[in-house]
């Protein structure tokens, strides 16, 4: 499970190659880039709810917080602006939250949190939305997301909003990262495969054009970077031994660093993780078995 989370963590580093180091992942925030900009981490304010939560203090809602680099550590506080605002005075409701791992985020990794909304809370903002704020008081990272509150969400288990497997079988769904077609991948619940694939392609194009990210943007570099980026953007479900299944080898990752001249940022690309997993070309795991394994993972 740690290796799986590490794989997903790399996605954040590659997609958000900036100085920020902690960010809300789910519900989808105004900005997917980690930021210390008060009070919502920058980005564009959403006018449509990203998710519907349960307004009942006896029920839990799932949020996902990610620390990309160590300076993003610290307890995460959740507040709610029921009027949909984003100013200091709007965030009047502090929500109760608990990290599933049992301790506050202290190191690089992905953290799932159960968040409770006081019973009877209603959203009065435009389109019936509230603004959810998540921030670390000790290290000062901020994120916000537009959400709705409705009792219909109270019947859904919080676990459903953690990780969900997708059986990618239709090629039209994933065109850029077509290496995952007909594969079972793990992505946050609610992810639209086509949109996610397009966003990954956009990240690829932007980074290839940015010399601060990719030092040598040759065609050989592009081929290597595409494989690495798609592998971490669409992590495959783990094998029967619990280890992640990678579609990139450690050698390919190291070649990417060298050919693309990203040696100065080598700490952001832990190629050693590829030596701990299984190559997808060597192991074929039945879909039913993968889903069973995933179900066990989500229990812990």
Swiss-Prot record:
It is found in: Membrane. It is a single-pass type I membrane protein. It comes from Dictyostelium discoideum. Residues 1-20 form the signal peptide. It comes from the Eukaryota. Its main location: membrane. Glycans are attached at residues 56, 217, 278. The chain crosses the membrane at residues 280-300. One of its GO terms (cellular component) is membrane. This is Uncharacterized transmembrane protein DDB_G0281067. Keywords: Glycoprotein, Membrane, Signal, Transmembrane, Transmembrane helix. The keyword Transmembrane helix applies. InterPro entries: Frizzled_dom_sf (IPR036790).
């Amino acid at each position: 499970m740690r290796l799986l989370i590490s794989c997903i963590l790399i996605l954040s580093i590659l997609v958000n190659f900036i100085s920020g180091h902690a960010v809300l992942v789910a519900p989808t925030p105004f900005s997917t880039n980690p930021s210390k900009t008060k009070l919502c981490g920058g980005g564009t304010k959403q006018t449509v709810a990203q998710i519907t939560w349960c307004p009942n203090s006896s029920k839990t809602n799932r949020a996902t917080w990610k620390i990309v680099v160590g300076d993003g550590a610290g307890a995460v506080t959740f507040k709610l602006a029921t009027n949909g605002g984003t100013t200091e005075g709007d965030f009047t409701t502090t929500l109760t939250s608990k990290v599933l791992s049992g301790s506050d985020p202290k190191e690089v990794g992905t953290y799932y949190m159960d968040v409770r909304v006081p019973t009877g809370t209603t959203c009065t903002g435009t389109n019936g939305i509230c603004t959810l704020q998540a921030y670390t008081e000790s290290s000062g990272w901020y994120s916000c997301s537009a959400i709705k509150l409705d009792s219909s969400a109270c019947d859904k288990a919080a676990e459903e909003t953690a990780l969900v497997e997708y059986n990618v079988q239709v090629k039209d769904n994933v065109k850029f990262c077509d290496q995952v077609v007909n594969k079972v991948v793990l992505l946050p619940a609610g992810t639209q495969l086509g949109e996610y694939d397009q966003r990954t392609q956009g990240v690829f194009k932007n980074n290839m054009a940015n010399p601060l990210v990719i030092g040598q943007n040759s065609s050989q570099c592009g081929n290597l970077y595409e494989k690495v980026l798609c592998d971490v953007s669409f992590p495959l479900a783990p094998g029967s031994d619990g280890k992640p299944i990678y579609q990139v080898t450690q050698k390919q990752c190291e070649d990417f660093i060298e050919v693309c001249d990203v040696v100065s940022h080598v700490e952001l690309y832990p190629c050693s993780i590829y030596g701990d997993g299984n190559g997808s070309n060597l192991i074929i795991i039945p879909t039913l078995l993968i889903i069973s394994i995933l179900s066990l993972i989500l229990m812990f």
